[in-house]
């Protein structure tokens, strides 16, 4: 049943998925140098997982072309800090905010058999020496607090709980915070996971239905890139 529903989702979005596959292949060589430079840099860091590197090229394709540009970046789900470090290392003038519980989250989310104290300690050490805003809290609570304080961001990366309900909640709150013409990037939305009660793509699809006149999907493969247009 999981595979059938995912197949139908992919079929419905076949055009954008196909275009996204070609784009990823096309730009791979373009970001080869900066990816290698970043990979060399993180050899001295302590990362047990490097999932983010799978999407490095497409991530940078949508980030500013000028490495000196001043922009605001928020990520939900920082884990050991690899994606945040990528921004801090490659964009010295960026303003980075990270949100993570570094603890057990929604009971419907995929279980992670890790020591979260150790994960948070790695995060702190990996980003040592950089200036950024770290928020340790539930993502929806943190996002609403940022909204109350009138924060806004140019880029928001959603990589927290992959349960569809949480993806939808994070996306709705992120929409309120992202600037017009700003981007929301969703991690790992085109997958089926038997350990999750409601799949990520279901939450993503619902978000797109709610805001269909206010957003534009630019990219959809293993990650999704959405632009806020109004």
Predicted segments with their positions:
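N-terminal auxiliary segments of SAM/dcSAM-dependent transferases
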Residues: 2-21
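Positively charged, low-complexity intrinsically disordered regions
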Residues: 6, 29-31, 228-229
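Class I SAM-dependent methyltransferase Rossmann-like catalytic core
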Residues: 20-67
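S-adenosylmethionine/decaboxylated-SAM
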Residues: 45-49, 60-230
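Conserved alpha-helical elements of sugar-nucleotide-dependent glycosyltransferases
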Residues: 3, 55-58, 83
């Amino acid at each position: 049943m999981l595979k059938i529903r995912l197949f139908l989702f992919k079929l419905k979005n076949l055009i954008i998925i196909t275009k996204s596959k070609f784009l990823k292949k096309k730009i791979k060589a373009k970001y080869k140098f900066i990816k290698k430079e970043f990979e060399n840099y993180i050899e001295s860091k302590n990362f047990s997982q490097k999932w983010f590197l799978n999407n490095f090229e497409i991530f940078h394709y949508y980030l500013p072309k000028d490495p000196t540009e001043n922009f605001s970046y928020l990520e939900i789900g920082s884990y050991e800090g690899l994606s945040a470090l990528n921004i801090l290392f490659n964009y010295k003038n960026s303003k980075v905010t990270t949100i993570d519980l570094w603890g057990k989250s929604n009971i419907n989310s995929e279980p992670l058999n890790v020591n979260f104290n150790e994960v948070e300690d790695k995060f702190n050490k990996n980003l040592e020496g950089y200036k950024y805003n770290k928020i340790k809290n539930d993502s929806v609570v943190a996002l609403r607090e940022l909204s109350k304080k009138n924060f806004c961001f140019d880029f928001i990366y959603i990589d927290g709980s992959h349960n569809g309900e949480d993806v939808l909640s994070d996306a709705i709150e992120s929409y309120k915070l992202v600037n017009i013409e700003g981007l929301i990037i969703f991690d790992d939305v085109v997958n089926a996971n038997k350990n999750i009660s409601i799949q990520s793509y279901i939450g993503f699809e619902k978000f797109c239905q709610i805001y269909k006149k206010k957003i534009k999907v630019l990219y959809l493969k293993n990650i999704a890139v959405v632009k806020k247009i109004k």
